[in-house]
């Protein structure tokens, strides 16, 4: 199970996805923790058993136990936050924006890894889940930490996992 195995499953009509996945993951130039934490958290966020099954072992092999757990925690907490804050944002009754969230999010304050790495993973998951408020929030944390826009986008750029997940899941029903 690996990136190469996942790429081999992508059908010919989605060759662009195969090439993009290879360049985004295979040639990122990122430190292993940033890259593989993003790969793991976005594979989880893609909700595709195929993608997760193929990428998780390689991510686990390239991450410390703490980073592996933190990447999974980023996917978990952002799945909750993305739904809550996206709903709050989409409601036409803006009074909902004044209500307390009442959600436990302790892992955000103490993720067990470098805070910037955790925020990158959260940013990538929020992009997949389509939560603009969460994207803005994580972007602000990254900018305050001195991360430039280009660097932030590049480090959290695993959008290919979502496209591959959708394609392979559709192929499973063909």
From Swiss-Prot:
Name the keywords, alphabetized: Antioxidant, Disulfide bond, Oxidoreductase, Peroxidase, Redox-active center
Q: Does the keyword Disulfide bond apply?
A: yes
- MF GO annotations: alkyl hydroperoxide reductase activity; disulfide oxidoreductase activity; hydroperoxide reductase activity; peroxiredoxin activity
Which domain of life does the UniProt lineage start with? Bacteria
- Its EC number is 1.11.1.28
Q: What is a biological process (GO) this protein takes part in?
A: response to oxidative stress
Q: Which reaction does it catalyse?
A: N(6)-[(R)-dihydrolipoyl]-L-lysyl-[lipoyl-carrier protein] + a hydroperoxide = N(6)-[(R)-lipoyl]-L-lysyl-[lipoyl-carrier protein] + an alcohol + H2O
For this chain, the annotated S-S bridges are: 131-134
Q: What class of enzyme is it?
A: oxidoreductase
- Which residues participate directly in catalysis? 131 (proton donor), 134 (cysteine sulfenic acid (-soh) intermediate)
NCBIfam families given in the database record: ahpD, ahpD_dom
According to the record's subunit comment, the protein's assembly and interactions are: Homotrimer.
What job does the chain carry out? Antioxidant protein with alkyl hydroperoxidase activity. Required for the reduction of the AhpC active site cysteine residues and for the regeneration of the AhpC enzyme activity.
Family recorded in the similarity comment: Belongs to the AhpD family.
Name this protein carries in UniProt: Alkyl hydroperoxide reductase AhpD
């Amino acid at each position: 199970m690996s990136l190469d195995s996942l790429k081999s499953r992508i059908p010919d009509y989605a060759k662009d996805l195969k090439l993009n996945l290879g360049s985004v993951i295979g040639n990122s130039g990122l430190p292993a923790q940033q890259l593989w934490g993003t790969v793991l958290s976005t594979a989880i966020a893609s909700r595709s058993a195929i993608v997760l099954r193929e990428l998780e072992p390689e991510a686990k092999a390239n991450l410390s136990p703490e980073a592996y757990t933190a990447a999974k925690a980023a996917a978990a907490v952002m799945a909750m936050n993305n739904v809550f804050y996206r709903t709050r944002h989409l409601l036409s009754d803006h009074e909902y924006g004044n209500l307390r969230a009442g959600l436990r999010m302790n892992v955000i304050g103490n993720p067990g890894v470098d805070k910037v790495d955790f925020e990158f993973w959260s940013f990538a998951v929020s992009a997949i889940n389509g939560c603009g408020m969460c994207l803005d929030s994580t972007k602000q944390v990254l900018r305050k930490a001195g991360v430039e826009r280009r660097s932030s986008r590049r480090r959290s750029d695993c959008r290919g996992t979502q496209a591959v997940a959708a394609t392979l899941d559709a192929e499973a029903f063909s």
